């Protein structure tokens, strides 16, 4: 009798724990995963952006959108518009940085961890905190 009551109690505790975990973590695969990450990252960016702007300026800007000016192009001297090449013959970006190949090598670890997180979210589930870490 005591064994069956203990087993029933243990089963109910395990069921409660699994329900709590399912609320904390969500299984997301494919497009659901991508949409959720975009939603989480975009909403946090908009919040941070709006927190940094005074309210009077928010009302003033409305729906206007301006592109940042990365580099001015010269119509008079088209040679200035070409990318810079150093003595070794390798392209350099505007800020003196190496092309995307070097950037990919440096970001390889973070890309792998993002792929691991995507796999984990699909198989076991992940929390919204885990997903917001990608932003």
From Swiss-Prot:
Pfam families: Insulin
Coiled-coil blocks: none
GO cellular component, one term: extracellular region
Entry's Gene Ontology BP terms: positive regulation of feeding behavior
Entry protein name: Insulin-like peptide INSL5
Maturation-removed propeptide residues: 49-114
Protein's cellular compartments: Secreted
Role: May have a role in gut contractility or in thymic development and regulation. Activates RXFP4 with high potency and appears to be the endogenous ligand for this receptor.
Quaternary structure annotation from Swiss-Prot or TrEMBL: Heterodimer of a B chain and an A chain linked by two disulfide bonds.
Family affiliation: Belongs to the insulin family.
The keyword Metal-binding appears for this protein: no
Intrachain disulfide bonds: 29-122, 41-135, 121-126
Gene (UniProt): INSL5
CDD domains: IlGF_relaxin_like (cd04365)
One GO MF term attached to the UniProt entry: G protein-coupled receptor binding
SMART domains: IlGF
Keyword entries, A-Z: Cleavage on pair of basic residues, Disulfide bond, Hormone, Secreted, Signal
Signal sequence range: 1-22
InterPro entries recorded: Insulin-like, Insulin-like_neuro_ligands, Insulin-like_sf, Insulin_CS
Membrane-spanning intervals of the chain: none
